[in-house]
Amino acid sequence: MSDIQLNSLKPAEGAKHAKRRVGRGIGSGLGKTAGRGHKGQKSRSGGFHKVGFEGGQMPLQRRLPKRGFTPLGQHLYAEVRLSDLQRLDVEEIDVQALKAAGVVGQGVRYAKVIKSGELSRKVVLRGITATAGARAAVEAAGGSLA
């Protein structure tokens, strides 16, 4: 391999395309109308409408009804899998421990354990609810919910 110098670096063959020069005469293939066709709104400078504009017809986003809402308390709750509890190296688990381990976000106030994955070690859940299946799995592993 030859010495590579900063002043000898060049892009690979075919990697760069020549800039499209429009409105520079008939011979260029992009003269006169410069690829814009003849007349009409789109041929003129500043001649573009906003996205969703339908020529004065009521646009689709206004014809369709509004639906649903965003619950404000959505980010307060988090679901935790049994496999997440298995990975934690503490026996007593509460929301603070889940936050510290990065299992749930910092804005979470309430957590619920769902039956997803395996749990083979004893854990004590404090201030955390669980589904019926998850509760059975925790108790089968020798743990409890406080």
Curated annotation (Swiss-Prot):
Superkingdom, natural source: Bacteria
Function of the molecule: Binds to the 23S rRNA.
GO biological process, one term: translation
Source species taxonomy: Bacteria, Pseudomonadati, Pseudomonadota, Betaproteobacteria, Burkholderiales
Family assignment from sequence similarity: Belongs to the universal ribosomal protein uL15 family.
Key words, A-Z: Ribonucleoprotein, Ribosomal protein, RNA-binding, rRNA-binding
Gly residues composition-biased segments: 24-34
Region listing for Disordered, in residue ranges: 1-65
Name of the featured protein: Large ribosomal subunit protein uL15
GO molecular function: rRNA binding; structural constituent of ribosome
GO CC list: cytosolic large ribosomal subunit
NCBIfam families in the cross-refs: rplO_bact
Annotated Pfam families: Ribosomal_L27A (PF00828)
Classification via Gene3D superfamilies: 3.100.10.10
